Regions:
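C-terminal accessory/tail domains of diverse enzymes
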Residues: 1-83, 112, 179-369
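Short, flexible active-site-proximal loops enriched in glycine and acidic residues
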Residues: 42-44, 80-93, 118-125
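Short, glycine/charge-rich beta-strand/loop segments that flank catalytic centers
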Residues: 84-101, 165-169
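Acidic, His- and aromatic-enriched active-site or binding-groove loops in soluble protein domains
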Residues: 106-127
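Helical (often loop-to-helix) elements that flank the catalytic cores of nucleotide-handling enzymes
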Residues: 106-113, 134-155, 238-251
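Coil-to-beta-strand transition motifs
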Residues: 123-125, 138, 224-228
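An acidic/histidine-cluster motif and surrounding catalytic segment
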Residues: 130
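An exposed, glycine/acidic-rich loop-and-rim segment of catalytic or binding clefts
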Residues: 136, 144-191
């Protein structure tokens, strides 16, 4: 049975003090309560009090997803302003110190902090998660296996976290370095079947490693409760249009890989050890790096590889109705990722507060506010 390839998009935002430009907790405001009145369960708190998350409805195509995520951003920007805050889409804050940030009062987060201690408290990061509807569990596993190869390229496009604790880190996605301190992160191994994956999960639960499968935080996973493959590798991009383009790319990749699987032409599987080399390069250099073409056993400029990647998925784009969204990736290759643009502002101004101001402007871009 053909998957639906429906879409769900989650974004995590920063709540900022407009005077200091530092992170500020939204918990003393009505932002979350008002958000739930307007958006119901599409908005929720996250582990730190200066993080707020939104999620789209189940969307039938990328244009429906665009409409939903734009609407969510608009609403959250207005809610932040109404409560004396500024909303920012960035995967790390340029200078905020996690030690100054409080954990949101919730038993689930208390348990994570109890288990992971400093690693959890310092996890002050903001991501983008994209769900693609793949109802057949065996197909979901095969698509997850093959998607692993493309995740470094997807991450490179999304990179948006070059600063940490007021320092230029030298990484385009420092968020990825922070998050890999958690257990059960990074790229997963490949699995021969859904039952093999299920056995892995059951063993972890049986041996008290986890109490539920949502604590498997890989860069891609079959979602334990939804009939989706969830891609979790991305930094949250600055612009909503970048989020839509990346979601469209993930959807098209899943569709292409399913078609290959149906034709008994599964994409070649490379070892996790090799794929992690490319992930490191994406984390470190973003779009400016050279990633490894394992087939050719050579380094290739990332922008060139993404061009080849776009050619690879091009034949499924018309049926998904995602041409406009996919074409925007070419613009992203020209303008650079959010990390590139943050660094450019810092080079020009030498002022991280100006970087925060730029991030706030970009968060609003294209939303007709």
């Amino acid at each position: 049975m053909r998957p639906t390839f429906t879409l769900g998009i989650e974004e995590e935002y920063q709540t900022i003090d407009p005077e200091t430009r530092d992170l500020r907790s939204h918990i003393q405001t009505e932002m979350l309560a008002q958000g739930k009145l307007r958006l119901e369960e599409r908005v929720k708190a996250e582990m730190h009090q200066s993080v707020i998350e939104v999620g789209t409805r189940i969307c039938q195509n990328i244009e429906e997803a665009r409409e939903d995520i734009y609407d969510l951003r608009r609403n959250m920007i207005h809610l932040a302003e109404e409560n004396g805050l500024v909303l920012v889409a960035g995967a790390t804050h340029p200078f905020a110190d996690w030690r100054d940030q409080e954990i949101y009062p919730d038993p689930r987060y208390d348990k994570v902090v109890e288990d992971l201690q400093l690693v959890a408290r310092s996890n002050l990061i903001f991501g983008l998660h994209v769900h693609v509807g793949i109802e057949d569990k065996e197909a979901a596993i095969q698509i997850m296996n093959s998607l692993r190869y493309f995740l470094p390229h997807i991450l490179a496009l999304s990179t948006n976290s070059p600063f940490w604790l007021g320092m230029e880190t030298g990484y385009k996605s420092y968020r990825a370095k922070v998050f890999e301190n958690f257990p059960r992160t990074n790229l997963p191994d490949s699995f021969g079947s859904y039952s093999e994956f299920e056995n892995y999960v059951n063993l972890l639960i049986k041996t008290n490693c986890i109490d539920n499968a949502k604590k498997i935080w890989w860069d891609v996973r079959p979602h334990p409760y939804f009939d989706t493959v969830e891609v979790r590798v991305c930094d949250i991009p600055l612009r909503a249009e970048e989020t839509v383009a990346i979601a469209a790319l993930i959807q098209a990749t899943a569709c292409k890989l399913w078609k290959l699987h149906e034709g008994n032409m599964d994409y070649r599987q490379y070892s996790r050890a090799l794929l992690m080399e490319n992930k490191f390069r994406a984390v470190r250099y973003g779009l400016d790096g050279k990633l490894i073409d394992f087939g050719k056993e050579s380094e290739v400029d990332e922008r060139e590889l993404i061009g080849e990647y776009l050619n690879f998925i091009d034949d499924v784009v018309p049926e998904l109705g995602s041409r406009s969204a996919i074409d925007y990736i070419k613009t992203m290759l020209e303008t650079g990722s959010g990390a590139d643009r943050q660094l450019k502002v810092f080079r020009e101004t030498g002022d991280l507060k100006m970087v925060v101001d730029y991030m706030a402007e970009e968060t609003r871009a294209g939303l007709d506010l």
